[in-house]
């Protein structure tokens, strides 16, 4: 199952909701899709959807999902990260009137670059590929060993220790 959440921001996120619905309708997505559509005005035709879900149900859907797709709000994509899942993150963009500014784009880019534990999608036409290649993406992310905070901390600490204790030969 794929779970999609657009959060609770009052502006619609039709671009994401419609894109996922069309991918399901075209057969690009073969598994069940459950969406939390928030204030989006597009009503999915091929996916199960709910305007809003209670927090407990959100956690349950995230835990059950094979793939979690979120908007760029930190609370939404931190939830799957906390249980070891790598989310596909599609930030809301000002140019599509999905938010009041581009802070979700900026934050998503920063997290993707610094942490390397999310799959960012800025161009919605790339979403189908990210879903189809999800297993390969997460496999490559996990093989670099930097998909968790602990792994990143350990890696950074190791580099610092090496610099401190490796002496140059005279």
Where are the language model's segments positioned?
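Nucleotide-activated sugar donor-binding and catalytic core shared by glycosyltransferases
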Residues: 1-170
């Amino acid at each position: 199952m794929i779970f999609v959440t657009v959060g609770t921001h009052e502006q619609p996120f039709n671009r994401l909701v419609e894109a996922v619905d069309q991918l399901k309708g075209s057969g690009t997505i073969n598994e069940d899709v459950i969406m939390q559509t928030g204030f989006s005005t597009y009503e999915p035709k091929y996916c199960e959807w709910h305007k809003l879900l209670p927090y407990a149900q959100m956690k349950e859907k995230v835990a059950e999902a094979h793939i979690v797709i979120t908007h760029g709000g930190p609370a939404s994509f931190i939830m799957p990260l906390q249980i070891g899942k790598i989310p596909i993150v599609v930030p809301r963009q000002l140019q599509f009137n999905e938010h009041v500014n581009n802070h979700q784009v900026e934050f998503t880019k920063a997290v993707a670059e610094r942490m390397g534990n999310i799959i960012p999608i800025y161009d919605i036409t790339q979403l189908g590929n990210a879903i189809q290649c999800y297993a390969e993406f997460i496999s490559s992310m996990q093989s670099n060993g930097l998909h968790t905070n602990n792994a990143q901390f350990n890696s950074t600490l190791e580099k610092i220790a090496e610099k401190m204790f490796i002496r140059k030969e005279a």
